């Protein structure tokens, strides 16, 4: 009976060790994926920053991705140039307001 208990304990130890190694491998892969996502976040353009040269590079907000909004600026010389910034479109602001209000009411 003692031999059976020793063999069972040994098997449990081996199984737990091998499964923990597999979990460590998965965690390492997830860590690499998270690092790649973090690099992408660093490269995106934050809210209220200029996006004239990269109109699709705005970061994500709380619920939606910011949109590159452009306006035409007339200089004192009369030249027209386009200036763009990352911002939240009005319909996204309205949706965020409704969701925030719903969270306050329903907890």
Curated annotation (Swiss-Prot):
Disulfide links within the chain: 44-59, 51-68, 58-86, 70-84
The UniProt entry's coiled-coil ranges are: none
Supply the alphabetized keyword list. Disulfide bond, Knottin, Secreted, Signal, Toxin
Segment forming the signal sequence: 1-20
List the GO terms this entry assigns under cellular component, sorted alphabetically: extracellular region
Entries under InterPro entries matching the protein: Spider_toxin_CSTX_knottin, Spider_toxin_CSTX_Knottin_CS
Reported tissue expression: Expressed by the venom gland.
UniProt GO MF annotations: toxin activity
Compartment list? Secreted
* Name of one Pfam family that matches: Toxin_35
Q: Propeptide residues?
A: 21-41
Instruction: Give yes or no: UniProt keyword Ribosomal protein.
Output: no
UniProt keyword Protein biosynthesis present: no
About its domains, the entry says: The presence of a 'disulfide through disulfide knot' structurally defines this protein as a knottin.
Protein family per UniProt: Belongs to the neurotoxin 19 (CSTX) family. 04 (U1-Lctx) subfamily.
Q: What is this protein called?
A: U1-lycotoxin-Ls1b
